[in-house]
A protein has these predicted regions:
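Short, internal strand/loop/helix patches
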Residues: 75-119
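Thiol-/selenol-based redox modules, centered on thioredoxin-like
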Residues: 107, 111-156
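Alpha-helical elements of Rossmann-like donor-binding domains used by nucleotide-donor carbohydrate transfer enzymes
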Residues: 43-46, 76, 104, 108, ...
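N-terminal "domain-start" segment that seeds a small globular fold
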Residues: 1-19, 39
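Thiol-based oxidoreductase modules, predominantly thioredoxin-like and allied folds used
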Residues: 55-72, 88-99
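Short, thiol/selenol-centered motifs that function as redox-active sites or metal-ligating centers
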Residues: 32-44, 63-66, 70-71, 129, ...
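Conserved helix-turn-beta segment immediately C-terminal to the redox Cys motif
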Residues: 24-25, 34, 39-62, 82-85
């Protein structure tokens, strides 16, 4: 099974086959609007703008799993991301990243990598749909290690 075999509901509630992103490098991030790391939205948007024409897509999956820091509705989350951080990368419905009710996307991502321990954990998926790397919450979108891993994934 590949990441691209999965489907996830967009923030608007429509089912989105992740095969839409097949052939691209994907950065999956669990997000939250009321977290000390929430400013990473700006960095993720910059990363998306810098790399989207090279084959990277950033996917945001809001989650209320850590500290109840994403309590809003889908409409609240989308409005917050758009007005506060001018987010244009794809956002999905709020998910559980671990435990009971874990989303199929996160069940796949955590098969060979640790579950997120906090908001803004990042998984890098290669063009082949396999998870290539995982980065903790404090790894910022402009971190050299993350960008190097993205560059390497894009080169394959």
């Amino acid at each position: 099974m590949s990441f691209f075999d999965l489907t996830a509901p967009t923030i608007q509630g429509a089912p989105q086959p992740l095969s839409t992103y097949a052939g691209k490098v994907v950065l999956v991030v669990n997000t939250a609007s009321e977290c000390g790391l929430t400013p990473q939205y700006a960095g993720l948007e910059a990363l998306w703008r810098d790399y989207r024409d090279k084959g990277l897509v950033v996917l945001g999956f809001p989650s209320n799993d850590f500290g109840g820091q994403e309590p809003g509705s889908a409409a609240d989350i989308q409005a917050f991301c758009t007005t506060r951080f001018a987010v244009t990368f794809p956002l999905f419905e709020k998910v559980h990243t671990k435990g009971v009710g874990q989303s199929p996307v996160y069940a796949f991502l955590t098969r060979q990598h640790d579950e997120p321990k906090w908001n803004f954990h990042k998984y890098l998926v290669g063009r082949d749909g396999a998870v290539r790397a995982s980065f903790g919450s404090t790894v910022a979108p402009d971190d050299a290690e993350l960008r190097s891993a993205i560059d390497a994934a894009l080169a394959t």
